[in-house]
């Protein structure tokens, strides 16, 4: 590629609405341009990287035995009504009517459509396992699109769907996709972790998220540095921090805590560790035609409620936070002084695992400006219902018993689910088993955010000059920067020769023949993030040398002109192999 025949749309300044590094750099590097909120044009530089991501994903999906197809972006409402998601999905599902007043959606995902394909095409167990995938543009009507391609409304995604006759087959399909994702993100040159996760709105029982590690990541990941354990904080098991409950050592006592409604303030006033205080959170579940059920969830003062875990407890699936009016009615006091001792009306108490093993702890007295110290289970309170209802913290024991938890930030770029029969039962996708009886197909679904990967890669790979692409997804692998291409025969002939040698070696190279000043050339390609640069100048050529600099290198080095192309090609091959 010659730069004079390519479109390079770099900018010196980022738009005012760009909040994070990847959004700023993608605009400045000429990769994207905004059309509407969360909707972008992908300019030539950006599209080249997209196509490289797609190629790696496609190769690994094919290698894993998945079969490519293409489903429509526009889907009839009837399919979503069959699955039940027409009512469940919410305003993120873009709905519209055609001229005949029929309801349609723009697909944010394709479980319904692919299940419709399967129920019409798969009739026997002999036709399974099968795994269909596509790479396609999708639309999710985010309430607040931001961060460029990281939280856009329109995006490119690879989604795959497996169909199996039994649980063993589903497990095998899932394993193949999990392994394929590990290969994909390794080939993309990204630091990533696969974490156990909650299945969210897709549904299903078992899932993993793939996160690119970045300080700007939206998701908190709990992992163990000395083992393979990793999980989304929302899904990570929180073990009790006290192995065995100690015998009571204090008498229960009501203490004045004027104006101290927070655990931290109470601990400071009473000169006790925060870990001896209890945080009381009030949840409610509604009962048709009757007053709500009120739940008191007890956490250690330094711990936080995990709502996803709470929602999975019996009776709490559709919980909400209690209103202040309800709290006063049941406890006799506003929030800040709540506790399980002496409530006005009966409540259901759930203690986190750590709280269940505590002794001599401090709770609210259900009276403004008062708490109760020296509280103990069995003596002052009945034994509680015990459950894991908190988020893990740094320093907690790892659930696998092989170390302690650390926390990092991650950007979700892939997700794999075991759906089971959620969609096949709802939509009647059955097959005849070995005995001729109809059975629901077992499904898995597997997504990769193609455009989101670009943003995540940049969040992990940048400096004050611009993007630093891994070789595998850089728009170009090498840029040739000739000094005086239009003025010096020696420079032009050498640059053209290097270009031809690199092309012949299968290297993705661009020759900057625009005639720009060196400073402009260097700034453009550093901003765009090309991993390797060769500078051809008369002074160096007279000594038989060409200047080489990797995008991550602090200093340039000199290479023999006659072997420079081969040397750079070898660097690229080594990087891709690694």
UniProtKB/Swiss-Prot annotation:
Pfam families found in the cross-reference section: HGTP_anticodon, tRNA-synt_2b, tRNA_edit
Keyword hit for Nucleotide-binding: yes
Uppermost EC category: ligase
One record GO biological process: prolyl-tRNA aminoacylation
Keywords: Aminoacyl-tRNA synthetase, ATP-binding, Cytoplasm, Ligase, Nucleotide-binding, Protein biosynthesis
GO terms assigned for molecular function: aminoacyl-tRNA deacylase activity; ATP binding; proline-tRNA ligase activity
Keyword match Aminoacyl-tRNA synthetase: yes
Origin superkingdom: Bacteria
Subcellular location: Cytoplasm
Catalytic activity: tRNA(Pro) + L-proline + ATP = L-prolyl-tRNA(Pro) + AMP + diphosphate
Recorded GO CC terms: cytosol
InterPro entries according to UniProt: aa-tRNA-synt_IIb, aa-tRNA-synth_II, aa-tRNA-synth_II/BPL/LPL, Anticodon-bd, Anticodon-bd_dom_sf, Pro-tRNA-ligase_IIa, Pro-tRNA-synth_IIa_bac-type, Pro-tRNA-Synthase_IIa_type1
SUPFAM superfamilies referenced in this protein's UniProt entry, alphabetically: Class II aaRS ABD-related, Class II aaRS and biotin synthetases, YbaK/ProRS associated domain
EC identifiers of the protein: 6.1.1.15
Domain notes: Consists of three domains: the N-terminal catalytic domain, the editing domain and the C-terminal anticodon-binding domain.
Summary of the function given for this chain in its UniProt record: Catalyzes the attachment of proline to tRNA(Pro) in a two-step reaction: proline is first activated by ATP to form Pro-AMP and then transferred to the acceptor end of tRNA(Pro). As ProRS can inadvertently accommodate and process non-cognate amino acids such as alanine and cysteine, to avoid such errors it has two additional distinct editing activities against alanine. One activity is designated as 'pretransfer' editing and involves the tRNA(Pro)-independent hydrolysis of activated Ala-AMP.
UniProt subunit comment: Homodimer.
Family assignment from sequence similarity: Belongs to the class-II aminoacyl-tRNA synthetase family. ProS type 1 subfamily.
Record PANTHER family: MITOCHONDRIAL RIBOSOME PROTEIN L39/PROLYL-TRNA LIGASE FAMILY MEMBER (PTHR42753), PROLINE--TRNA LIGASE (PTHR42753:SF2)
Protein name: Proline--tRNA ligase
Species name: Burkholderia orbicola (strain AU 1054)
Top-level taxonomy: Bacteria, Pseudomonadati, Pseudomonadota, Betaproteobacteria, Burkholderiales
Encoding gene, per UniProt annotation: proS
């Amino acid at each position: 590629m010659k730069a004079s025949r390519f479109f390079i749309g770099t900018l010196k300044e980022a738009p005012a609405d760009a909040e994070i590094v990847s959004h700023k750099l993608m605009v400045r590097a000429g990769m994207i341009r905004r059309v509407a909120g969360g909707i972008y044009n992908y300019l030539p530089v950006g599209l080249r990287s997209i196509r490289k991501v797609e190629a790696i994903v496609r190769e690994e999906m094919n290698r894993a035995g998945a079969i490519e197809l293409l489903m429509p972006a526009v889907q009839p409402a009837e399919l979503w009504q069959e699955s039940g998601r027409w009512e469940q999905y919410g305003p993120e599902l873009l709905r519209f009517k055609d001229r005949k007043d029929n309801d349609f959606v723009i697909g944010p995902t394709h479980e319904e459509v692919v299940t419709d394909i399967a129920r019409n095409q798969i009739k026997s167990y002999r036709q399974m396992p099968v795994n269909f995938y596509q790479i396609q543009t999708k639309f999710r009507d985010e309430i607040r699109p931001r961060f460029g391609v990281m939280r856009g409304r329109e995006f490119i995604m690879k989604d795959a769907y497996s169909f199996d006759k039994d649980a063993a087959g589903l497990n095998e399909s899932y394993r193949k996709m999990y392994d394929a994702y590990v290969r994909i993100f390794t080939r993309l040159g990204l630091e990533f972790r696969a974490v156990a996760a909650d299945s969210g709105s897709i549904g299903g029982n078992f899932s993993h998220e793939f996160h690119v590690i970045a300080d700007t990541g939206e998701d908190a990941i709990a992992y163990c540095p000395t083992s393979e354990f990793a999980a989304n904080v929302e899904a990570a098991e929180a073990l009790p921090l006290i192995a065995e409950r100690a015998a009571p050592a204090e008498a229960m006592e009501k203490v004045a805590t004027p104006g101290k409604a927070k655990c931290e303030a109470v601990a400071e006033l009473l000169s006790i560790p925060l870990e001896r205080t209890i945080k009381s959170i009030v949840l409610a579940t509604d009962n048709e035609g009757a007053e709500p059920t009120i739940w008191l969830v007890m956490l250690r003062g330094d711990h936080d409620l995990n709502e996803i875990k709470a929602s999975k407890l019996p009776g709490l699936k559709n919980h909400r936070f209690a209103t202040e009016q309800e709290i006063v009615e049941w406890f006799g006091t506003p929030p800040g002084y709540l506790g399980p001792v002496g409530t006005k009306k009966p409540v259901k108490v759930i203690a986190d695992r750590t709280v269940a093993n505590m002794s001599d702890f401090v709770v609210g007295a259900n009276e403004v400006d008062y708490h109760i110290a020296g509280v103990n289970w069995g003596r002052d309170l009945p034994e509680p219902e015990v459950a894991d209802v908190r988020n893990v913290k740094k320093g907690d024991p790892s659930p696998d018993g092989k170390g302690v938890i650390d926390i990092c930030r991650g950007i979700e770029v892939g997700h794999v689910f075991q759906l089971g029969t959620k969609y096949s039962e709802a939509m009647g996708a059955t097959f005849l088993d070995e005995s001729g009886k109809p059975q629901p197909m077992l499904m898995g679904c597997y997504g990769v955010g193609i455009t989101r990967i670009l943003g995540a890669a940049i969040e992990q790979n940048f400096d004050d000059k611009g993007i630093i692409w891994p070789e595998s997804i850089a728009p170009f692998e090498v840029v040739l920067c000739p000094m005086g291409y239009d003025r010096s025969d020696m420079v032009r002939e050498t640059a053209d020769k290097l270009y031809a040698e690199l092309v012949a070696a299968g290297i993705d190279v661009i020759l900057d023949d625009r005639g720009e000043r060196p400073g402009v050339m260097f700034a453009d390609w550093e901003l765009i993030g090309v991993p390797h640069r060769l500078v051809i100048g008369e002074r160096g050529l007279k000594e038989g040398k060409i200047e080489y600099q990797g995008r991550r290198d602090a200093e340039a080095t000199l290479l023999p002109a006659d072997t420079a192309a081969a040397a750079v090609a070898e660097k690229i091959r080594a990087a891709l192999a690694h």
